[in-house]
Amino acid sequence: MLKKLFSFSDRYRILHQTWFAFFLTFVCWFNFAPFATTIGKELHLAPEQIKTLGICNLALTIPARLIIGMLLDRFGPRITYSILLMFAVVPCLATALAQDFNQLVISRLLMGIVGSGFVVGIRMVAEWFQPKEMGIAQGIYGGWGNFGAFGAEFALPILAISTSFFSGGASNWRLAIALVGIITAIYGVIYYNTVQDTPRGKVYKKPKKNGSLEVTSIKSFWAMMISNFGLIFALGLLAWRLEQKKIHFLTLSQMYLTWLVLAGLFAYQSYKAWQVNRELLTGKKTYPVSERFQFGQVALLEFTYITNFGSELAAVSMLPAFFEKTFGLEHVVAGMIAATYPFLNLVSRPSGGLISDKFGSRKWTMTIISVGIGVSYLMAHFINSNWPIPVAIAVTMFAAYFAQAGCGATYSIVPMIKKEATGQIAGNVGAYGNFGGVVYLTIFSLTDAPTLFSTMGIAALICAFMCAFFLKEPKGSFAPAYEGEASETATKSSVFLTEE
């Protein structure tokens, strides 16, 4: 595959167009962090408000990834991604025109929807590439797309400075953010007109039922319910944070009302899950062994994504301000240094997928990388102003490599679970990455950077233990074609994790 990577024909063209779509959504999603201190000074924001905006940036991505996953499985990645790209201009312009904290909160909440675009490409890539090369294909998609976070950290400050003549010599952050949204919307139109959901002659397989994931055992149903509650909890945590005295975006009664709405959302979500799985729960339907999958394995992948992508979200959001305050740097310089973290996505996430393809065990690849995440963040815990800046950068890049390689390893497994429900499963796993980001950034907003780093390190080591003892090796994960598919033509269901 690597030899033909830059041929830009057939499936490789689709891969490149799709990772670039993801790249643009990430540039949009992270366009606030490089300007956090500048915006804070201009709009007179307190440090706690800036931290809260970082949490808001992640919040709606949690339900959005679930919804996008269902829409994706029903309508296909071409339509879903195109609409999402065109929508990106709305929160970008809202941020660029914001005049106070409340307007920024609304714009960053909407921007979280754009951050759900990652899920779409997972299904697109899974349709065009074989299981034996799924790791590297998903790694390139995820890694090169995630490079958009670097594009935001590094390029946007330069763009803002280069257009400063429009704002009387001051850094023109508003124009930089607006331009990114406009470019992304234009690319959405291009994407719609130039890609296809599947190779010619291949059937795009859709779930038989919509509204919730169809599981194959009662045990998996209850595991899914617990998983769904965790995501609602993350949104409730955000509402609590927005009610705190130093933030006070919500009143106490508004917070309780938000919790009530979230409880209603969970009840509705549970009803839809029961409706989709009613025949299973009432004993009217049983699934043959070949069609079963364990939702517990999905839950483990959700945990891995908390520790790798969740920590990456937190790090990318707080590192510019961390370097600026710890070492007394100018915000542009601090942003460029912090950009070394997302910069590594270009190679680290693909390498995680490639190692998973070549190592011979996706389970042990995931376990070893999780250990690396834990150790590297525990090292970052000790960074302070007495450290040489190059050493601090090196430790940051060490943490970045393992966190991003872990993302590649996670999504080398996700498409192997149940092919026709890849969107929903990828949405669940991806949403838990945002869950991790919200929890980690909430911890950061209440404590400090060393506490955040140690928390992320300990969580990753616990995850490594869970993977070593409970994660199962996906069946058929090194096969030349999906189970039941003859080369490019889909005929039967593709299920790779069987329930015992």
UniProtKB/Swiss-Prot annotation:
Q: Which domain of life is it from?
A: Bacteria
Q: Give the UniProt subcellular location, in the record's own words.
A: Cell inner membrane
Q: Which GO terms describe its cellular component?
A: plasma membrane
InterPro entries, per database record = MFS, MFS_dom, MFS_trans_sf, NO3_transporter, NO3_transporter_NarK/NarU-like
Q: Where are the membrane-spanning stretches? A: 19-39, 52-72, 79-99, 109-129, 147-167, 175-195, 220-240, 247-267, 364-384, 389-409, 425-445, 451-471
Q: Name the family.
A: Belongs to the major facilitator superfamily. Nitrate/nitrite porter (TC 2.A.1.8) family.
Main function: Transport system for both nitrate and nitrite, with much higher affinity for nitrate than for nitrite.
Supply the name of the protein: Nitrate/nitrite transporter NrtP
